């Protein structure tokens, strides 16, 4: 059996690795990277360190408006599907890559496997919610992480091909968290790249991320969030999302922050380490919230 797997963001590579290790024992897999998220951390070191298969195809789509990005992905994915003629197409989660892969396969009648099906926020302003609902509607096999996800699909009259298989993110976090203790704390702090000044090691910390448009597009919200970070009883390690960097830099020109360690986005294992050992995590990321639960870190 031949499966074409579509991924476009770093978390999807991590999740796909957990499944690919099993698939490739018995089946042929073609791994397609849409290029949705260009990440300097996704070098050969990223794939080697995490034992992740390197992509067989990189479409190199890059950033753009939602419509343009999704359309360009669909064109590239369709070319791959017509060439490879797979038995199934597999997609993960709720990114534009997910939707593009599902639509491209559906149009040429290739069955679709959706991993992490059935998740709902019930906020239709979120692009992720739109992507996951549309992908579920045209998928053949819907692999749900929880019984709640199964029930969500039932409410939408989707019952065929639905299975509760457990959470692949949990598999990935548990697998990679075992690798963290191979290095001392100093090793991970040496990897932190300060945006405005060098970063020194600290004994305890909070880990914070902000990336949702509801927060990043409003300078007053960012100002209030950073003010709250300043009041915490330990330093806040804050990997700054590219979307947030301009506003953060502007606010730093207005006010000196003493309790916040502004750092560049970090690699997956580094991030996992700082989440696992944080006093608490503060985030608007659904994925990170789930990781904190798995790692037993307050959030």
Where are these regions (language model features)?
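Structural motif
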Residues: 2, 87-88, 205, 279-280
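Short, glycine-rich nucleotide/cofactor-binding loops
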Residues: 3-13, 211-219
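Active-site and donor-binding regions of nucleotide-sugar-utilizing enzymes
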Residues: 4-7, 13-22, 46, 58-157
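A short, Lys/Arg-enriched amphipathic alpha-helix followed by its capping loop at the start of a domain
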Residues: 19-28, 228-232
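Conserved nucleotide-sugar phosphate-binding/catalytic loop shared by glycosyltransferases and other
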Residues: 28-69
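A nucleotide-sugar donor-handling region in carbohydrate enzymes
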Residues: 37, 41, 138-216
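Donor-nucleotide binding loops and adjacent catalytic segments primarily
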Residues: 44, 181-277
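A donor-sugar binding/catalytic signature common to diverse glycosyltransferases
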Residues: 91-92, 142, 272-299
